[in-house]
A protein has these predicted regions:
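His/Asp/Glu-enriched, well-ordered alpha-helical/loop segment
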Residues: 1-8, 21-114
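Active-site glycine- and acidic-residue-rich loops that bind
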Residues: 12-17, 91
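C-terminal cap of metal-dependent C-N hydrolases
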Residues: 24-31, 36-37, 41, 108-154
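Short, surface-exposed, low-complexity cationic segments
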Residues: 150-164
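Tryptophan (W) side chains
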Residues: 176-180
Length: 180
């Protein structure tokens, strides 16, 4: 409590639970989907005083730059699938995870030869490069590498959410067919 009072904000913790060797082994498992539990702080103002985890700004860029491009631990299509359709199915997120008519238009346009993470533990507030466009719910959030200021995102809950009328925490067998 003294640390929280002295700091005047949230106190974060970074745990080192997996070796790089284990990360590479798990990356090769085809049923592993990718995600992040890190917050997305703005790299400006009061947020620059926080000690964010480097993956706050470079998690997915690191996946593409290190494990796809450099190590060839998985293919580009497999990485994209495991960042989109697979987690959407795992979390029962309706109308998400695919580029399909009637689905929410959440799209990231990047150059697979240039995408790169730059954040480190000593300098965590470094944005990734190689991402050109980000479209959230059909609206540009990043256009030609520049943030637009649009706030078109929304909180998304799958069927595992306790308030869901559908109930359940996994996609049905029928829903799984389209991801493989």
């Amino acid at each position: 409590m003294d640390l929280i009072i002295k700091d005047g904000s949230r106190v974060g913790v970074i745990y080192f639970l997996m070796s790089e060797d284990n990360v590479r082994k798990e990356t090769a498992l085809p049923w592993m989907s990718f995600g992040s539990d890190e917050a997305a702080p703005a790299p400006q103002g009061v947020f620059l005083e926080s000690n964010a985890h480097p993956r706050a700004y470079g998690n997915f860029a690191k996946l593409f730059a290190t494990y796809v491009r450099a190590d060839k631990a998985l293919t580009l299509p497999d990485a994209i699938h495991r960042l989109t359709a697979l987690p959407a199915a795992n979390l029962s997120l309706k109308d998400r995870g695919l580029l399909k008519e009637g689905y929410f238009a959440d799209i990231v346009v990047f150059d697979p030869n240039k995408i790169q993470d730059h954040s480190t533990y000593s300098k965590p507030h470094q944005l990734a490069s190689g991402v050109n466009q980000v479209i959230v719910n059909g609206i540009f959030a990043l256009s030609d590498g520049v943030a637009t200021g649009a706030r078109s995102g929304q909180f998304v809950r799958g069927r595992a959410w306790t308030g869901s009328k559908e109930g359940g925490c996994r996609a049905t067998a029928k829903e799984w067919q389209w991801i493989w």
